[in-house]
């Protein structure tokens, strides 16, 4: 009987701990929404809140017009654990801080350890923005380039910008060519892109045009129709426009 009671208490404690962790993770997601981090979209997995799906859209510099999928893997003890989240890109990304073998991003230069209550996931997303906006600045404080995840990329960035830019473009082209690939998971929260379909996306596009005409009347009739909309579907029948290329 005593063993049964102890086991029950242990289960209740584990359940309470799990619920508390879920609330903390939800709070992290809400903070991301309130911070309005632009150019990056993330959502926790439906099946496992410790795994997040994300997409980065480059808007300037070497990585302009890039679309990189990535995952955020939170430690089992997040956010109380000092271990930092893991950021892993789905495909090859050329950057001094991204390992060419594992596609993992080294965030230890900004987050040597996770400080519960001080460090937050929206800050990690801001860091991702920063390292792509200015890759050279992101490694400026590193004295030994051999300590970087991709020292060869670092060397090119410092000595041959054209060659570096060419490699980056190759990775961008490859990544964008696989945007519409079949999802590797059946998780309903996986971010799915779909090609423009007039019967599905047309009404939403019309609403966007009308909204723009209402908000900025001076721009009506200028430049013709918008093209190249990127769309994301986070669940069946729910489409959201992300950007105009």
UniProtKB/Swiss-Prot annotation:
SUPFAM superfamilies: UBC-like. Pfam families: UQ_con. It comes from the Eukaryota. Residues 20-177 form the UBC core domain. Belongs to the ubiquitin-conjugating enzyme family. FTS subfamily. This is Protein crossbronx. It comes from Drosophila virilis (Fruit fly).
């Amino acid at each position: 009987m005593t063993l049964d009671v102890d086991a029950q208490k242990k289960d209740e404690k584990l359940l309470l701990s799990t619920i508390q962790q879920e609330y903390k993770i939800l709070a992290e997601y809400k903070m991301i929404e309130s911070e309005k981090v632009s150019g990056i979209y993330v959502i926790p997995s439906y099946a496992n809140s410790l795994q997040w799906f994300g997409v980065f859209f480059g808007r300037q510099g070497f990585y302009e017009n890039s679309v990189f999928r990535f995952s955020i893997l939170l430690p089992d003890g997040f956010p109380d654990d000092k271990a930092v989240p893991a950021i892993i890109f789905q495909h090859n990304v050329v950057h001094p801080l991204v390992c060419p073998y594992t596609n993992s991003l080294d965030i230890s230069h900004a987050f040597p350890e996770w400080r519960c209550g001080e460090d937050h996931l929206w800050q990690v997303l801001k860091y991702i923005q920063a390292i792509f906006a200015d890759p050279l600045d992101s490694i400026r404080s590193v004295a030994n380039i051999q300590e970087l995840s991709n020292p060869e990329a670092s060397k090119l960035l410092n000595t041959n910008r054209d060659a570096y830019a060419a490699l980056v473009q190759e990775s961008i082209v490859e990544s964008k060519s696989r945007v519409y690939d079949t999802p590797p998971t059946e998780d309903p929260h996986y971010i799915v892109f779909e090609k423009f379909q007039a019967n599905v996306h047309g009404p939403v596009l019309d609403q966007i045009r009308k909204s723009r005409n209402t908000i900025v009347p001076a721009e009506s009739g200028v430049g013709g129709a918008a093209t190249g909309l990127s769309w994301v579907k986070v669940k069946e029948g729910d489409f959201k426009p992300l950007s105009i290329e």
